């Protein structure tokens, strides 16, 4: 994980909001076809609906978070599910504690 890329990813309010929502997906999203959102993640269409923006914009935001290493993606059938990468977020917290 590159700290500059992480900070760039988090500098957008909507991307930060996505990361916050994914911390407690059951609280922020309706269930999706029997998927355990805490284990598998949240479908891009659910994130798009909650953001009230186009799927292409939401997908761009998710790609930026993915490239920064803050989230993981898993494709199941025709859907892609996203969840936080807790290990990477823990490393970011450690970086902030020790380096800044």
From Swiss-Prot:
Keyword Disulfide bond among UniProt keywords: no
Span of domain HTH arsR-type: 1-100
Cysteines joined through disulfide linkages: none
Keyword terms of this UniProt record: DNA-binding, Transcription, Transcription regulation
DNA-binding region: 44-67
GO BP annotation list: regulation of DNA-templated transcription
GO MF terms held by the record: DNA binding; DNA-binding transcription factor activity
InterPro entries: ArsR-like_HTH, HTH_ArsR_DNA-bd_dom, HTH_MetalResp_TranReg, WH-like_DNA-bd_sf, WH_DNA-bd_sf
Coiled coil: none
Protein name, per record: Uncharacterized HTH-type transcriptional regulator YbzH
Phylogenetic placement of the source organism: Bacteria, Bacillati, Bacillota, Bacilli, Bacillales
